[in-house]
Amino acid sequence: MLLISDLAEHTKNLGADTRASLLFDGTVGMDNPLTGARVTVTGHLAPSEDPALIARYTARHPGSEMYLGFADFHLYEMTVDRAHIVAGFGAIHWIESADLLFDAEGFEDLAAAEADVVEHMNADHADAVGLYATKLLGRPQGDWKMTGVDPEGIDLRCGGETARLDFEKT
């Protein structure tokens, strides 16, 4: 999901061609970034008005609610085609979306209950949510809140800091 203004040049470009790519760079702080991991995800962007996706996005990015109220801001959902992964110098691969993305089929009940699960955990188990962040992820003490849950893990937020706790694979 991307929140984009209609006034932005890239949004105008999307009107002519919906193809897009996003770079995720894991090389911050490395002495030699060429040896670090990064992935470019390619696909197509389309506007989304799905209430569940909007709720998930605004829970993860609380400041975005203000912009969603503006007539010229819209959420776009990317349909991923494939990814170009550089896992370090010379370790380069193309991966198709089916091998990259989690197949959420069979988890519709979790998606439908996500808001209730998050509300319950924050209201009744705030101490546990804080421990997830501090003990399991090594994050600093703070008022950690759960912002999302999906079949692969949970999303946490404390002020401007976010964290992801992945579930163990079985």
Question: What are the residue ranges of the model-derived segments?
Answer:
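Active-site-proximal cofactor/substrate-binding loop regions of enzyme domains
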Residues: 1-5
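Short, structured beta-strand-loop surface elements
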Residues: 7-73, 79-82
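C-terminal edge-of-domain segments
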Residues: 69-170
